[in-house]
Amino acid sequence: MALFSKILIFYVIGVNISFVIIWFISHEKTHIRLLSAFLVGITWPMSLPVALLFSLF
């Protein structure tokens, strides 16, 4: 398995985990929850830690 494939699998797993986390953290309407979970999911290396910090306050 090439390095690119391993990185891609790691990224997809991170997308799925962050999508689920943000889906349960947000308390908006369903379509807004879906949009926010999707956007945080695809940019999870930078935005997931920020979203988790904001959810603490």
From Swiss-Prot:
Tree of life domain: Bacteria
Chain ranges passing through the membrane: 7-27, 37-57
The keyword Lyase is annotated on this UniProt entry: no
Main location: membrane
One Pfam family linked to the record: Toxin_GhoT_OrtT
Variant or mutagenesis effect after changing I21R: Protein remains toxic
Membrane topology annotation: Multi-pass membrane protein
Locations listed in the record: Cell inner membrane
Keyword line: Cell inner membrane, Cell membrane, Membrane, Toxin-antitoxin system, Transmembrane, Transmembrane helix
GO cellular component terms listed in the entry, alphabetical order: cell pole; membrane; plasma membrane
Disruption of the gene: reported phenotype: No visible effect in the absence of stress. Reduces MqsR-mediated persistence (overexpression of MqsR increases persister cell formation). Decreased biofilm formation after 8 hours at 30 and 37 degrees Celsius, biofilm production has risen by 24 hours. Slight decrease in swimming motility. Cells grown in 20 ug/ml ampicillin in the absence of ghoT and which overexpress MqsR elongate, suggesting MqsR inhibits cell elongation via ghoT.
Induction record: Expression controlled by its antitoxin GhoS, which digests ghoT transcripts in a sequence-specific manner. Post-transcriptionally regulated by MqsR which acts on the ghoST transcript selectively, degrading the ghoS segment while leaving ghoT intact; conditions which induce MqsR (e.g. overexpression, nalidixic acid, azolocillin or H(2)O(2)) decrease ghoS expression and thus increase ghoT transcripts.
InterPro entries found in the cross-reference section: Toxin_GhoT/OrtT
Protein family per UniProt: Belongs to the GhoT/OrtT toxin family.
Purpose: Toxic component of a type V toxin-antitoxin (TA) system. Causes membrane damage when induced by MqsR, slowing cell growth and increasing the formation of dormant persister cells; involved with GhoS, its antitoxin, in reducing cell growth during antibacterial stress. Overexpression causes cell lysis, forming ghost cells; both effects are neutralized by expression of GhoS. Overexpression in the presence of ampicillin increases persister cell formation (persister cells exhibit antibiotic tolerance without genetic change).
Name the record gives this protein: Toxin GhoT
Record organism: Escherichia coli (strain K12)
Gene encoding the protein: ghoT
